[in-house]
Amino acid sequence: MVFLDSVWIEGASRTGKTKRLLDRLCEQIDDREATDDGGRRDRQSGSPGLLVISATSSDRRDLRDRLGARMRARGAYPTYAIDTTTPLGFFRREVLLFWPLLVKTLHLSAHFPLHVRPETEQELATALWRRALDEGKLRQEHTSEYRLVRRILDLFQLAAARGLPYEDIPQLLQDGFGLDDDLPFLWESMGACLHQWRQWCLERGLLTYGLMTELYWRHLLPDPVYRDRLTRRYRAVFADDTDEYPAITRDLFEILLDAGAVGTFTYNPQGGIRSGLGADPEALQRLGDRCQYEQLKRPSGLRETFGPIALQLLDNPAIYARPAGMEFQALPFAAIQTSSRAQLLRATGEEIAAAVRQGQVKPGEIAVIAPGLDAIARYTLMDHLSSHEIPVDSLNEQRPLVSSPTIRALLTLLALVYPGLGHFLDRDSVAEMLVILSRSPENDIEIVGAPRSWPGREELPIPPASAIDLVRAGLIVDHCYAPATERPRLLPVNVFPRWDRLGYRATQAYKGIVDWIEGQRKQVEEERIDSASILLDRAIAQFIWHGSKLPHREISALRELLETARHYWDVDRRLQDYDRRQDPEYVTVGEFIKLLRQGTISAKPFPVDPPHDGEGAVTLATIFQYRSARLQHRWHFWLDIGSPLWLQGGAATLFAAPLFLRDRPRQPWSETEQLDTDEERLERILNDLLARVGDRLILCHSDLATNGQEQNGPLLSLLSGWVESDRATCKPYF
């Protein structure tokens, strides 16, 4: 059945789909205000609101801000609810709101639901499956224990996103991968472990993302009581970028449409950024058959002219493809070609610096995009550009929390306060802690030629100086640190025979740290500190914050540490209450330190944005990060175009993800099907990125990869087809 009031808006990248959706949303608000007599009827009856869904949280914030700007321009606001959310956020909220209904339906214990974050989920699942892992029931060739556990949990999430019962996962894997070797036994073991995991979580009221998604589509959405409440809450649904949604969202939208809600959906055939991560574009595309169809066509970037030519070059690398009548010199392309990747990174940094210095482009108009950015590449580019005073924004960079010296210092502090954690300490970590914790604005020394408080000093995100430098910290640790497994201690400074060599500031700072540790240790012994998260909060207030402006990265790390600690202790308290046990606090602290040192937890910068000047910063991102952020820049530098990762999808594809597409027949996964999938993904990537580059595309290639292997990826045909040989040098033609 086609709903005449509902609209399916289809268009390529940057053709105005979101703007059209906002237009429809504002029209709906205006029509409703007029129909309901200025909103007075809404206020009296509490009539249904509007459901607005975006693909990611960043898209949701952007859409919400744009809608708010339009409302402010109108000078009027709707008097009913406008819910802005993401698919996963919607599932989570609905499961929490209707948890009593699920408790009644599934006969669960009446625990208040507690969300479990992915890193905690990994730790709990590993502990639960320890016996199966040790006995070899869960073992896959060339796969570590950590990755295998993550794969099993991801399979549960993929099945839930498709709307597939988790009991069918072993059979689906067997149909897809065949009956070779011991794989059927492995699939059955995975299924048994997932059943055990699901029951274990439900008994304790713990909800992972996968479990919340499964509870929503399998138990909540079919429930007639919930359906009645759902359809009465929303009279219209607006979904942006539906090509990034899981298949079960189509079931949700169809229920709302059948109940009379008006729908507006946008779809990008060249999108599918989250294909391989649970999104199912083909399943959502079928929703368009039930709506009026609108197609948007608007030239954007280089796609209109060079998108079809790029696909020709992929099919036939031998041709020199360019628009008719356009000479090579007029093409908006250049190349940087070197022998080694180290040379390539340096040359790329030099060319960016030269272009900015000559005024050809601003830093905020440049994006460096790569199929995969390792830590060395990030550091090299950021260090090189920073040396030229060019700001760099590493998009969604998620470094492990433990990589921050401040976080390591706080973990060391925990090990000194709580007993039985001496095995986590060494002399270097204690010395580092002394340097970090002795920071204070009072220690800022005068800068040559400038007073201590020069104009603008208070606005700069510069951490204060340390009263204890590295040399003094080393001397203190050598003479005043008493290592011990049970109770390591920092001894009084006068234990050091030549403590006078430390100086007054260092001595006083050290004494303050020791006194604070002893005071907190006494409170721990008296059980006056409920959890280590309280101790961390006190330590940050005492030693780190000082009311000063910390660097953006350090603020993000501290906030994530506190959030992680609070979450970890909430989960631990739930488990101890359920099991009716009372573990010593130091045991939980030790497990928390071990979890952080594994490097699985990273700092997420939202909602703090790094400050830049008016010219912005050079964006550094992977393909997936850049496309997910839906950015556009005048200049693009495509790194490692000879890398096979352009074709393979890299980390943006979960294990067995194509098998979980709703419309895929259950048949063995073949190499031909894999090749077709990779080629389709590459075509989408090329069209999408070409739509996001405005004036200039620089192809960056090194003959050898980091591991010394020759690079012969599929995008090398672009280099030969678009850039003349005399321009494909280390110094590109501009």
Q: What is the meaning of each model-derived region?
A:
Residues 1-6, 41-45, 359:
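Phosphate-binding P-loop
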Residues 2, 6, 182-288, 293-302, ...:
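Conserved helicase NTPase motor core
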Residues 13-32, 300-388:
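Helicase P-loop NTPase motor core
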Residues 360-522:
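ATPase/helicase motor core of nucleic-acid motors
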